Structures are given as C-alpha cells and as structure tokens.
Amino acid sequence: MHIEARLFEFVAAFFVVTAVLYGVLTSMFATGGVEWAGTTALALTGGMALIVATFFRFVARRLDSRPEDYEGAEISDGAGELGFFSPHSWWPIMVALSGSVAAVGIALWLPWLIAAGVAFILASAAGLVFEYYVGPEKH
C-alpha cells in the first residue's frame, strides 16, 4: 500500500499546485478576476486525493509488506490465489444498468425514474452481494 499512498500523494500535490497556478493565472489574465469554479474544483480534487493517500498510509502501517512494495520484486513473487471471482455473474451488469437508469432520471429530472433507478440499484446490489449466500436451512 506504500506505492498507492505515494501515487495519491503525488496526485494531490499536482492538483493543489495546479489550483494555485490556475487561480493566479486567471486573476492576472481573465477579465472578471479569479475563476472560482475551476479553482475550487481543482482544490477539492487535491483534497480528495489527499484523503485517499492518508487512508492508504494508515492501511499500509497495519498490513505486512506486499511484493508491490519492493523495488526488485518479480511478477512471480505475487503469484498465488487472490480470492474468489465469479466470471459468469450477471449482477454487475444489472448494477450498471440500474445506475444508468438513475443517472438518466437525474439528468432529465424525472423523480419517478430516479426512484425506480434507486430501487433497482438496491435490488441489484443485494443480488450481487448475496449471489452465493445459501442460508443455514438450505443444504
């Protein structure tokens, strides 16, 4: 997780420096002064990247080092089982379609379509999470 933390720290620094430069340059060359929408968006993007970097730093302290954290690591060092993967599941497609329905409802401001999209998102997310769950009474 050290590599991921360092990556997001560089991204955060880039966006903060970009926000400062953008604010200074728009105040110097724009007719209306500082363009606050872009400056605020860049600053908030840098802040969000810093939040993610901080989270990865805290996680990296609690976990053991991974092969990705070593400079001289080989691809074979990370070999092994990574976890369960369901290649034939339809639920991710249903979650994406449900999110699309909700996004179209928001874009067109149709409250009934927003409600339907949110309901579909909840149902499809539950289907995704509980796809392989078999209750104690079913054997």
UniProtKB/Swiss-Prot annotation:
UniProt keyword annotation of Cell membrane present: yes
**Assembly state and interactors?**
Associates with subunits I, II and III to form cytochrome c oxidase.
Q: What does this protein do?
A: Part of cytochrome c oxidase, its function is unknown.
Gene that produces this protein? ctaF
Q: Which organism is it from?
A: Mycobacterium tuberculosis (strain ATCC 25618 / H37Rv)
* Mode of membrane association: Multi-pass membrane protein
GO MF annotations in UniProt: cytochrome-c oxidase activity
- The entry's protein name is Probable cytochrome c oxidase polypeptide 4
Name the Pfam families for this protein: Cyt_c_ox_IV
Q: Which residues cross the membrane?
A: 10-30, 36-56, 78-98, 101-121
InterPro entries on file: Cyt_c_oxidase_su4_actinobac
Its organism's taxonomic lineage begins at: Bacteria, Bacillati, Actinomycetota, Actinomycetes, Mycobacteriales
